[in-house]
Amino acid sequence: MDGCFVPLIKMVKGWNRERGWPIRSFHLETMIYEHYKNYEKAYTYDSTLKVFFNDLPGYLRSPCYDPVTSDRLDGYLDNGTNPTKRTEAIEKAERAASKTSEAMEYTEAGKEQKAIEIWESLLGEFFPAYG
């Protein structure tokens, strides 16, 4: 992913912050790293985010381990409340996946301004400057 990895993490963390921090920071970083560690070339941010958000609900349904210590990182999501934090995080990730698809459709239809509005609402202040 070359130099795209840190900005990508910042954008996904921006989404997380805008949603009330449903996923702990290191847990999120670990999922992003695991998702993209084998990518050999950089893609556009919009397509990269779309793929990640489409896969994020599945990652949230599975155990996640610290790559160094092998400690479980996602136990906080199962806090015994109803609905669990895991369910809430998955629902937020599914909505994000839907929004990224919608933004991509607007881009493909030549409606960049509408796509930008969706990205801004999704990523907050971490949406890259446009223009």
Where would I find each of the regions flagged by the language model?
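Aromatic/basic-lined ligand-recognition segments
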Residues: M1
